[in-house]
Structures are given as C-alpha cells and as structure tokens.
Amino acid sequence: MGVELYKHNKVAYEKVEKMFEKENRVAVVHPTGSGKSFISLKWLYDNRDKKCLFLAPTLAIRDQLIRHIKSSGLELSDFKNLEFAIYPNFASITDEFLEQHHYDCVVLDEFHRCGATEWSKGINKLLNHNPNIKVLGVSATPIRYLD
C-alpha cells in the first residue's frame, strides 16, 4: 500500500527527498497535468507520522488531492496528522492557532500564489513561527505576473 508514481515523478520525488536532506524548503516545478499532486501526496504519505498541512488556493484543488488519496487506494484516515486549509482562510491565521497546531511539514500547492500580498501573511507567519518546518512547494507557473 502507498502512493505509486510514474517514472518521471519517481525521479523528481527522489530529488525532493535528497534535497530535504540539506534544505527545509524544496520546490517542484512541473507542467500542468504532470502529476505534481501525486508527488505531494507521496510526500504527505511518507510523512504521515508527522503533523502536516496541505495548503491550496481553492477548495477545488484541496478536493482534488482528497480524490487522489482515494484513487490511490488510501483513505483520509490513513493521514491522521494531516490538516487542510486554503490560502484565503489561512491569511488571517493567529499566533494562538499556530501554537496549538505545530506543523512539521507543509505542502504549498500552487506555491506561486503565496506571493500575493494578503495570502503571504499567513504563510510568513507560519514560517516565522516554525523556521524548521519542511516545506514542499509545487507549481506549474512559479513566476507571478500579476504583481
């Protein structure tokens, strides 16, 4: 049981794991539809004993990961320490919340959106609260053109 990856994603995942040996923040930049969500899912599964957070820009993208969990033969109950949030809601996160929810790992889906003025507030607070948190950012478009 676990998350099976296509060959090109296995190569990327192995590089992610290698980078996490030296760094706390790693980014995967792959084209749309290439399986970034499955790389995220495998990383969350492999770290399921840790307190993890999956942050997405929309409920639709959050729900997509949940569908991938189920299509991989897993259940949400296999991820007892995983929480979900969306950037708009996380922007107003409080210090008290972060004290009560000490995360070890976070996936930033479409991480380029973290650069948005409002959405970055919660992310910055999270990273400042826990500078040793492992961060996996995934995006097909890592450059923000709207700023």
Language model features: what each stretch is:
Residues 22-43:
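Walker A/P-loop
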Residues 58, 86-89, 138-142:
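A short beta-strand-to-loop transition that corresponds to the Sensor-1 phosphate-sensing loop
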Residues 109-111:
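Walker B catalytic acidic pair
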Residues 1-29:
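Conserved pre-motif I regulatory segment
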Residues 51, 80-81, 103-105, 131-136:
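Loop/turn-to-beta-strand initiation segments
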Residues 62-102:
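Inter-Walker segment of RecA-like/P-loop motor cores
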Residues 113-147:
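Post-DEXD/H (motif II) to motif III coupling segment of the RecA-like Helicase ATP-binding lobe
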Residues 51-58:
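Conserved RecA-like ASCE P-loop NTPase motor core of nucleic-acid helicases/translocases
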